[in-house]
């Protein structure tokens, strides 16, 4: 975000964490995305949402199993197939109930009922492993979507 210039790694110049503004849309950056999302209709559908971040560990935040999406087995299938191919890339999966807390994945899931996943890469993860795992995750994702 533009707040990085002032030392605010998670905030924009308005001192707002943009990943806590979804559904509220008080900032110009998230408001612009809301306007684009409103254009989706029955002929131009959103089917999946991935939100990329970095943090301490390789982790995927996903919907809780009690929350059904339009692609009910997508996330579980995608991550399990990928894990089989990624012997050297360790990651955890953290199911969470969707709350109205301004987080993008929760907003998207609640509004569109599509798999909405936060994809976290560890800050200290070897960059070559990140690159190779990203290729695997992308390939497995596309295979499932095309089945």
Question: Model-predicted segments: where are they?
Answer:
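Active-site/substrate-binding loop(s) of hydrolase catalytic cores
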Residues: 1-84, 88-92, 116-118
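Active-site-adjacent mobile loop/cap segments within catalytic or ligand-binding domains
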Residues: 19, 60-63, 68-69, 94-147
């Amino acid at each position: 975000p533009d707040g990085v210039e002032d030392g605010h790694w998670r905030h924009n110049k308005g001192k707002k964490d943009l990943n806590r503004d979804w559904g509220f849309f008080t900032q110009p950056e998230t408001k612009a995305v809301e306007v684009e999302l409103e254009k989706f209709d029955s002929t131009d559908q959103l089917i999946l949402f991935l939100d990329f971040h970095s943090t301490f560990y390789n982790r995927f935040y996903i919907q809780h199993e009690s929350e059904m999406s339009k692609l009910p087995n997508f996330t579980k299938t995608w991550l399990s197939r990928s894990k089989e191919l990624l012997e050297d890339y360790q990651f955890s999966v953290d199911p969470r109930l969707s709350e109205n807390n301004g987080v993008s994945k929760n907003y998207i899931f609640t509004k569109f009922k599509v798999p909405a996943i936060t994809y976290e890469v560890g800050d200290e993860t070897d960059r070559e492993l990140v690159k190779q795992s990203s290729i695997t995750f992308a390939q497995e994702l596309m295979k499932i979507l095309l089945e």
